[in-house]
UniProtKB/Swiss-Prot annotation:
It is an enzyme of class 6 (ligase). The keyword Ligase applies. The active site is at C82, H169, E171. Homodimer. It comes from the Bacteria. Its EC number is 6.3.5.2. Residues 5-195 form the Glutamine amidotransferase type-1 domain. GO terms for molecular function: ATP binding; GMP synthase activity. GO terms for cellular component: cytosol. Pfam families: GATase, GMP_synt_C, NAD_synthase. This is GMP synthase [glutamine-hydrolyzing].
Amino acid sequence: MNKELVLVVDFGGQYNQLIARRVRENRVYCEIVPYTTSIEDIKEKAPKGIIFTGGPNSVYGENAPRVQKELFDLGIPVLGICYGDQLMAHSLEGEVTSPEKREYGKTDVNLDNSSLLFKDMKEKDQCWMSHTDYISKVPKGFKIIATTDECPCAAMENVEKKLYGVQFHPEVEHTLFGKKMLKNFLFNVCNLKGDWSMSSFAEQQIKAIKEKVGDKKVICALSGGVDSSVAAVIVHKAIGKQLTCIFVDHGLLRKDEGDQVEKIFKDQFDMNLIRVNAQDRFLGKLKGVSDPERKRKIIGEEFIRVFEEEAKKLGNISFLVQGTIYPDIVESGTNTSATIKSHHNVGGLPEDMEFKLIEPLRELFKDEVRAVGEELGIPHKLVWRQPFPGPGLAIRVLGEVTEEKLAITREADAIFREEIAKAGLEEKIWQYFACLPNIQSVGVMGDERTYCHTIALRAVTSSDAMTSDWARIPYEVLDKVSRRIVNEVKEVNRIVYDVTSKPPATIEWE
């Protein structure tokens, strides 16, 4: 099946993956490619449309990203966003100027709704600006189709060549008409059908994995979370018993999780599954370590070492499956964005790893992974299981990890999850968990002074983990959770609730 393709050309902007997500929401497949991609490679991919992302550079910068001018003569519709808009103008002999003051934040914009890009839209609406330079003179053949008080060219078009540029960011929620505008570009300008689906994605992945693997053996890093589970099922459907799932029980799992994982994948999916009990090994490596980055790296390296040892027992293993998804790649700074924290599927990989990687989900956001899981017939409860980091409770126990701290966190987390489920909120909240800050405080219980641990509760709403907001859990639910934890987990005398969004905070505390 030949699928329609849109290329998102990456110039280093912070919203690049969000642009890809917005395209896919319209059932159009897209790929992100670096700005260095050659004209020949673009022709070979035969995209139906191209989107230039924003970026931190000025077109006049010495090392500013460029594209070959011939790209604009291929007859392929192009939409430039922010820096991409300025680059289009600069490349085609328009003029880009640095003003006295920059334009940033929510901004009123005047739209020419006779343009296909702004068809069926209001003449005035709100957009999100984040730029210093702006286009002061459009290239020959272009006309201005949007303005703001500070920006004389907030959008431009060359209808004949199907070239469009916008100075604002249509991909973010603050641009109220942004999704509609992108839809207009995809369907009114590029004339796409929008027939890409999760079932077609799964079919393509299964076919590609069969071709890549051949008759070789594969192991899968199975945690029982949504990502690794869906990755395992895709690969299992492709190669069957050539796949062996290795489930490392590192002692950092949630309550009863190890037994549940073993039961589901052995009994229900009939997979080859090896459960490795490695709690002592991991806790030994983590002894005395409090830095979160070191904890992540240690756990990532130990995971791979365990797999290597198990692979040697199995003999002649060529590939390792991982449940890496898009936000993992973004947060690990593997493109031009800054490293925020290393992800266990990315930054924790030792350089001397002996396997070739299979990462069938690395192009998907979490909600897309769940959709694929449903398509593959994975039980609903597993598909909607809470996201859980590879390092497990090690990054929910702040500071040094000990058996005692793990036990406290595990029990508090189980109570929190149980009460969220009872309240019917488990699919309404993206992620919720308890963590153990390295804090003790004074309390009074039964006329006696206590000096015990504090538990922090974290719950967020999101659709893709790129951004999130703290969940407005009803007070009565929080009250019940608090009372139960304090009464049932004797080492705890204080409960706090985290009311920070992402950004500025990340979802996990470490």
